[in-house]
Amino acid sequence: MSLILIYIHGQYGSPEEAEHYRALLPGCEVIGFDYKAQTPWEAEREFAEYFDGLAERGCGSIGIIANSIGAFYAMCALAGRSIAVAYFISPIVDLERIEGVTLDEEHLRYVRQHPIDWRVPTHILYGENDNLT
């Protein structure tokens, strides 16, 4: 395999959704990441541990496919890591500005104190009426 793609699901999603992308990305190994994080600060620890483990095993080039809040968590947790490419599906890119959502104080403080600096080549797919992206 030339590229390992880690699928990061959205809220209420599952790592099994990775199966949908295997047929679309021949030549890539697509792996579903079964994360438990419910906040960006939990994702920072959990995602970093998982991705650093892959890198230490010499897995070669690593990319991500991330959906909705999974994309936001990925950008928070993996911004400084060596990621070859990212594919985002209806990503939440700014948690503070989601229409109709009021963040609790802890989330708001986190978002303001941890601006995202994402420098990974990224492809974004979203629907015409998507109001989260």
List each language-model region with its residue ranges.
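Short beta-strand/loop motif that positions the catalytic acidic residue
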Residues: 118, 124-126, 130
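Conserved alpha/beta-hydrolase fold motif
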Residues: 61-64, 86
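Acidic catalytic loop of the alpha/beta-hydrolase fold
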Residues: 13-14, 128-133
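Short, surface-exposed "cap/lid" segments of acyl-processing enzymes
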Residues: 1-40
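Gly/Ala-rich beta-loop-alpha elbow adjacent to hydrolase catalytic centers
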Residues: 65-74
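Aromatic pocket-lining residues of Rossmann-like dinucleotide-binding sites
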Residues: 77-81
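Active-site nucleophile loop of the alpha/beta-hydrolase fold
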Residues: 35-38, 87-97
